[in-house]
Regions:
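A non-catalytic structural micro-motif
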Residues: 45-46, 181-187
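A short acidic, helix-capping loop that chelates divalent metal ions and anchors anionic groups
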Residues: 13-16, 93-95
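Substrate-gating cap/lid alpha-helix
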Residues: 165-173
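Noncatalytic carbohydrate-binding groove/subsite architecture in carbohydrate-active enzymes
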Residues: 1-2, 22-164
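Asp-box/WD-like beta-propeller blade repeats and closely related beta-sheet repeat scaffolds
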Residues: 6, 18-21
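Active-site neighborhood of divalent metal-dependent phosphoester/pyrophosphate hydrolases
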Residues: 6-12
Length: 187
């Protein structure tokens, strides 16, 4: 094992169980313990901070940018030998597109690959982590091509992405990542 990601989308309440507060500081309590255990086993294994779900504040989630800032306020900046896991999903928007439009799936910076990359890097830079690598541990474009019927109402944007968009945008996202300094692996 060369790398371990500590958790997945900890800013979603459905991923959270227990009594530790549901916020970035609560995640850092768990990350601190995991980091110490991993480092006791291996001084060189890559430790990846759990990738956040790109979302705003809802009953089931904390805005990913807010959650990341909470993590920094709780000590994330003290770690120099880690990578930041990110999930820069882009709904029905091309990877180089930036916010905002009026269609409902393009009216929020959370819905844009490019905005997600830029905003995460900015928050990292503000907290002295400009050199830290970002690992894209989830990304991609969903399509409804080949499925019968219609997607649920909140997933109608999938009708705007065909299989060719999905393939081409994935390739372009890899190209964007390869051009960025401090970009780690992209899954």
């Amino acid at each position: 094992v060369d790398a371990v990601e500590v958790w997945n989308e900890p800013n979603l309440v459905r991923e959270w169980v227990g009594t530790i507060p549901f916020n970035g500081a609560g995640y850092m309590q768990l990350f601190d313990a995991a980091y110490a255990a991993i480092r006791a086993h291996s001084p060189s294994m890559t430790i990846v901070v759990g990738g956040l779900a790109p979302t705003g504040d809802t009953a089931g989630s904390i805005d990913d940018r807010t959650f990341l800032r909470q993590m920094y306020a709780a000590g994330l900046g003290n770690y120099r030998d880690i990578a930041l896991g990110i999930h820069p999903y882009s709904w029905a928007n091309a990877p180089e597109a930036v916010c905002c439009g009026t269609a409902g799936w393009d009216d929020d910076p959370h819905f844009f690959f490019a905005d997600n990359l830029r905003d995460y890097r900015q928050i990292m830079s503000e907290n002295g982590h400009a050199e830290l690598p970002m690992w894209v541990t989830e990304f991609g474009w969903a399509t409804w091509d080949g499925f019968p019927g219609q997607p649920q109402q909140d997933s109608q944007w999938m009708l705007r992405v065909n299989q060719w968009d999905q393939a081409n945008w994935t390739i372009r996202a890899f190209q964007i990542g390869q051009q960025m300094p401090n970009m780690g692996p992209m899954f």
